[in-house]
Amino acid sequence: MAKQKFERTKPHVNVGTIGHVDHGKTTSTAAITLVLSKAGGAVAQAFDQIDKAPEERERGITISTSHVEYETANRHYAHVDCPGHADYVKNMITGAAQMDGAILVVSAADGPMPQTREHILLARQVGVPYIVVWLNKADMVDDPELMELVEMEIRELLSEYEFPGDDIPIIPGSGLKALQCGCGSRDCEWCGKIWNLMDAVDSYIPTPERATDKPFLMPVEDVFTITGRGTVATGRVERGVIKVGDEIEIVGLTEAPRKTVCTGVEMFRKLLDQAQAGDNIGALLRGVDRKDIERGQVLAKTGSIKPHTKFTGEVFVLSKEEGGRHTPFFNNYRPQFYFRTTDVTGVVTLPEGTEMVMPGDRVTITCEIISPIAMEEGLRFAIREGGRTVGAGVVVSIIE
């Protein structure tokens, strides 16, 4: 019997299954929960429980995603699985489900297919740092040479997208066979393969750096003046820790960042000596005038982030049914880019040979925005027209 409550003492890691349609992502997810449930590390979830993924909205975009959780001896995992290919594209681009690592499911019987390639490309573009391969349906392949061939193909494909193809663990097995058996034993022919997979995930995907250990950053949501005390910027601390007396910078919307010192931290009308990632705070800033800071800028640890105006982005364009545009857009399209808390107008350059982009498409674009924004690779944004979301994107590389 699984413990009702997960102990939160173990390090937490976010993973997800990716891969071509019908290669067995959901079946394998169900098999992981069943096998681990035998060791008290999960509540077994049936295929159809996972498959009927609830719809969620992220940045105005509807995505169907299933979340399961489980634990191994060393870690607690949150695992996402999506029913449809479009859901994966949207999920990865919006960052609705940030992945510290992915389990790439490839059918041994079919080898890599078009969506296998697309998901690897997406993982590279949106910054999924590690991939472990589950070579599913291994029960359907009798020829060891064929298995070897498929494995080579997968390694080449991973290397092509700058993943370390030669080092990535590839674990053969069968989600379906493990589900049908369900004994959960490490010695079992099929359940043991699921344990092999989890051991690889445990050892190959590193524990991510916690948000509090990263350099301080807080998007400015609002600014006001407290008579006799100075200017206060409010917002939710995105990462890191801010202590009273820290030197920080105001970054974005101006050419050069502006240095200041945080002279007070307030939360729920109480004064604190520090705040950390996740806290909603007001930060009192020394020598900053009300007009020197505005929504859309960020407060950040000095030197940790710079303002930029030109970047490439991986973008998903909403379909008409999702409330997006009804018509395609062309080169020099000028929407607003919504970064963190503000809209900035920009101009879009399409890749060579792309005439236009249809609603529902995924595309890599180059953008130039009219005001600099504190930006780094992996930053998510929405594309809007007059306040209506028509696309979602992620910064892939910064040009200037």
From Swiss-Prot:
Q: Where in the cell is it found?
A: Cytoplasm
Does the entry feature the keyword Endoplasmic reticulum, yes or no?
no
Record's subunit section = Monomer.
Name used for this protein in its record: Elongation factor Tu
UniProt source species: Desulfitobacterium hafniense (strain Y51)
* Cellular component GO terms, alphabetical: cytosol
Q: Where is this region: G5?
A: 174-176
Catalysed reaction(s) here are:
GTP + H2O = GDP + phosphate + H(+)
Q: Which HAMAP family match?
A: EF_Tu_B
EC primary class:
hydrolase
Q: Where is this region: G4?
A: 136-139
Q: Which CDD domains match?
A: EF_Tu, EFTU_II, EFTU_III
Q: Name one Pfam family in it.
A: GTP_EFTU_D2
Binding, GTP? 19-26, 81-85, 136-139
Its main subcellular localisation, reduced to a broad class, is cytoplasm
G1: annotated span:
19-26
Key words of the record: Cytoplasm, Elongation factor, GTP-binding, Hydrolase, Magnesium, Metal-binding, Nucleotide-binding, Protein biosynthesis
Amino acids binding Mg(2+): T26
Annotated family? Belongs to the TRAFAC class translation factor GTPase superfamily. Classic translation factor GTPase family. EF-Tu/EF-1A subfamily.
Gene (UniProt): tuf
Q: What's this protein's function?
A: GTP hydrolase that promotes the GTP-dependent binding of aminoacyl-tRNA to the A-site of ribosomes during protein biosynthesis.
Return the annotated region ranges for G3.
81-84
Q: Does the keyword tRNA-binding apply?
A: no
Q: Where is this region: G2?
A: 60-64
